[in-house]
A protein has these predicted regions:
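Intrinsic-disorder/low-complexity loop/linker signature
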Residues: 45-46, 89, 123, 171
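Membrane pore-forming effector domains from diverse proteins
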Residues: 1-28, 54-117
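Long, helix-rich, hydrophobic modules that act as membrane-proximal anchors or helical bundle/coiled-coil regulators
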Residues: 94-184
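Short, cationic, amphipathic peptide segments
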Residues: 29-57
Length: 184
């Protein structure tokens, strides 16, 4: 089964390329570029003082092609969300529910708070700590939009995310999404 590309709301490119390499194997046409920079002028065999290294990979297939080729394997590899316990590590799980907007702000504050995407699922809430550049066009712009455009948001989705912890006071989970796909 494949996913309609138009239904992809969020796609973490780092996660997808890492999983693609793991599941399919390295892309024989991949190009790996390493860049070093620094200001200290010291570069020993094992020690770097003030030196940074950045690695980039270029594949002969697009991230969406990678995602399509591993979709079924991702479905099989990860469990559906059923329970989570703080202080026992993170879990990568499938969650299904309604994608909406959430907001954190001080009690009684009239100023706008921190807005984020939130998943409502089985009576639970999960706040997504997301990289806005991985959102489909239009989805990242909603945060700066008028409040008149932010009502009635409830998109049915299936999401693969790393659940990191539960905030007891706020009664919600916090997760880093890897994939969010609209269900219809």
């Amino acid at each position: 089964m494949s996913v309609n590309d138009d239904k992809i709301i969020y796609l973490d490119l780092e996660f997808v390329s890492r999983k693609y390499e793991q599941k399919i194997g390295g892309d024989p046409a991949a190009t790996i570029t390493k860049q070093q920079g620094g200001n200290a002028g010291i570069n020993a065999l094992f020690a770097h003082a003030g030196v940074t290294t950045q690695e980039s990979r270029t594949f002969s297939v697009t991230s969406r092609q990678m995602f399509q080729s591993i979709w079924n394997q991702l479905i099989d590899e990860y469990d559906n969300f059923s329970e989570f316990e703080n202080y026992s590590g993170t879990k990568v799980l499938w969650l299904e529910g309604e994608l909406t907007l959430g907001e954190w702000k001080s009690s009684g504050s009239k100023e706008a708070g921190y807005q984020f995407y939130q998943l409502n699922h089985n009576g639970e809430r999960t706040a997504f700590v997301a990289n806005q550049s991985y959102l489909a066009p239009g989805f990242s712009e909603i945060f700066g939009a008028s409040s008149a455009l932010k009502g009635n948001i409830g998109i049915p989705v299936k999401c693969l995310a790393r659940v990191m912890w539960h905030v007891d006071d706020a009664k919600n989970y916090v997760a880093c999404p890897y994939v969010i796909v609209e269900q219809s």
